[in-house]
């Protein structure tokens, strides 16, 4: 945690500077009252509702004692729960066991379902975000009854029937969205339909329902958990999808094909009986747009997931490059080609433009300011049907991305490590901007900077009086509930950036990028010198 210290300085004379300084001071005071242990417990609880976290941000001090007691109680309860397993667990000499590929260096024997016996079903329901069930043996799908059967061997006792229910989606705490996810029944049976299709590799079963259609949720709730759950199979796995969508495969097929060598199965649409030697039903998830390497085989991290994106989009990006090069050749535009070559040396900035709420009203001025600083600027306005490879191509080649808080910020995953990500943070969205994009961006190795607007940079400033609570105290407004937050700060607000103030951020980003480039050029030169020396000696 960053420790903040009070500074004594001369009072500024400009009203704008005073407003900015007051906002910074308020942020410092908020950080000063946070307790690390409380913050950890608070963060977990508030994943249940965005507004719940923000609304209770101001009540942390009064609730500190209660939350500490609650945290201590939870710790003792967990210790009592797992103590018998740790101290008295023994392995039966005659038991045939199958480990679901745990990490080689972890204590996976202490985790639920880290070891799954043959002809058994084990469900891990201990995680806050998701349930995951494991089936080992003769596994058969039965779409008509929304079931997956595990055929028990004839030697198995008749009273060992297991029937588990699961909704394979990674937002377990959100009852409203989980109610829309198809529920599967996982059952042990003595007899089942014959196999129509026999697979020699495992199945991973998950839903592409819920919030699918929003790019943040497609990556956070779907693709990253799919990577976490399946990457250790080295593509020798079949994906079985509930609520299968052709458009989803069209959009994400490049990534899915890097995780599986087999075509996916539409669980509801394919009524044949598919048989597998094992199945994982549900997906693991760690945190927002990130991967906990300590929980992964071979310490895979979000950087490894990004490398997979490189591999997935590279063929399509090369095809787009060839098409554009061919078009340039056909147009015979020598002047355009000359301009492109000259612009390649300038640091590139991509501005993610919004057309609805939270739009930058003076976007043209922002572009001109960035160009004046020295950037080559590209403005993108991604739509739901925008090809991801084209967005990847733009962001993978840029040095800086600028955008207002929203789902499109998920595309920071396409940026190269050590690139700069500037997120414009509207009023009332501080926590969400940091939680969902700021922290994950730093984990990916990006240079993250939050540009928190002042009240006068919000369109709400023109709608309400300057002393209105909506402008002066967004936390108390957010405390009224999610619908109020959504209406006021997410759907009802645009931004008009103070160009003079924002230019300082642009200058810092430009200086960082140019220094980084010089270091890279120096390193390349140092690597070339020994080679040239060897050639001379020859």
Roles of regions detected by a PLM:
Residues 2-22, 27-538:
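The feature primarily captures lumenal catalytic ectodomains
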């Amino acid at each position: 945690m960053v420790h903040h210290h009070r500074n004594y300085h001369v009072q500024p004379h400009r009203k704008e500077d005073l407003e900015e300084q007051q906002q910074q001071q308020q942020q410092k005071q908020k950080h000063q009252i946070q307790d690390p242990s409380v913050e950890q417990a608070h963060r977990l609880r508030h994943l249940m509702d965005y507004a719940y976290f923000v609304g209770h941000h101001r009540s942390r001090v009064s609730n500190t004692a209660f939350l500490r007691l609650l945290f201590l109680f939870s710790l003792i309860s967990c210790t009592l729960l797992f103590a018998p397993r740790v101290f008295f667990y023994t392995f039966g000499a005659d038991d045939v066991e199958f480990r679901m590929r745990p990490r080689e260096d972890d204590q996976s024997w202490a985790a639920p379902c880290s070891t799954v016996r043959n002809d058994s079903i084990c469900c891990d329901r201990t995680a806050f975000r998701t349930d995951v069930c494991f089936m080992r043996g003769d596994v058969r799908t039965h779409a008509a009854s929304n079931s997956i059967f595990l055929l028990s061997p004839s030697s198995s006792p008749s009273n060992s029937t297991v029937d588990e229910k699961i909704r394979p989606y990674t937002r377990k705490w959100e009852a409203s969205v989980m109610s829309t996810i198809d529920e599967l029944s996982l059952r042990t049976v003595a007899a089942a339909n014959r196999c129509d299709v026999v697979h020699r590799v495992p199945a991973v079963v998950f839903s592409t329902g819920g919030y699918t259609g929003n790019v943040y949720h497609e990556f956070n709730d779907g693709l990253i958990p799919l990577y976490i759950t399946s990457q250790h199979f080295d593509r020798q796995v079949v994906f079985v999808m509930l609520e299968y969508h052709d458009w989803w495969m069209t959009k994400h097929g490049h990534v899915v094909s890097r995780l599986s060598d087999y075509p996916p199965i539409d669980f509801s649409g394919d009524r044949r009986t598919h048989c597998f030697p094992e199945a994982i039903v549900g997906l693991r998830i760690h945190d927002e747009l990130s991967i906990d390497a300590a929980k992964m085989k071979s310490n895979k991290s979000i950087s490894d997931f990004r490398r997979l994106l490189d591999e997935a989009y590279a063929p399509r990006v090369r095809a787009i490059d060839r098409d554009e090069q061919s078009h340039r050749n056909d147009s015979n535009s020598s002047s355009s080609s000359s301009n492109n070559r000259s612009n390649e040396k300038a640091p590139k900035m991509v501005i993610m433009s919004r057309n609805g709420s939270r739009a930058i009203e003076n976007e043209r001025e922002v572009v001109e300011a960035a160009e004046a600083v020295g950037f080559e600027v590209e403005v993108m306005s991604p739509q739901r049907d925008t090809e991801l490879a084209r967005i990847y191509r733009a962001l993978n080649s840029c040095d800086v991305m600028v955008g207002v808080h929203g789902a499109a910020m998920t595309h920071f995953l396409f940026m190269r490590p050590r690139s700069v990500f500037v997120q414009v943070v509207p009023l009332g969205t501080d926590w969400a901007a940091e939680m969902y994009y700021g922290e994950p961006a730093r984990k990916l190795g990006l240079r993250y900077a939050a540009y928190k607007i002042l009240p006068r940079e919000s369109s709400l400033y023109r709608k309400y009086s300057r002393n209105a609570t909506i402008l002066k105290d967004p936390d108390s407004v957010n405390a009224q509930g999610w619908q109020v937050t959504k209406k006021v700060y997410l759907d009802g607000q645009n931004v008009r950036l103070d160009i003079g103030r924002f230019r300082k951020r642009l200058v810092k980003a430009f200086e960082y990028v140019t220094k980084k480039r010089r270091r890279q050029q120096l390193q390349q030169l140092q690597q070339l010198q020994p080679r040239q020396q060897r050639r001379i000696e020859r």
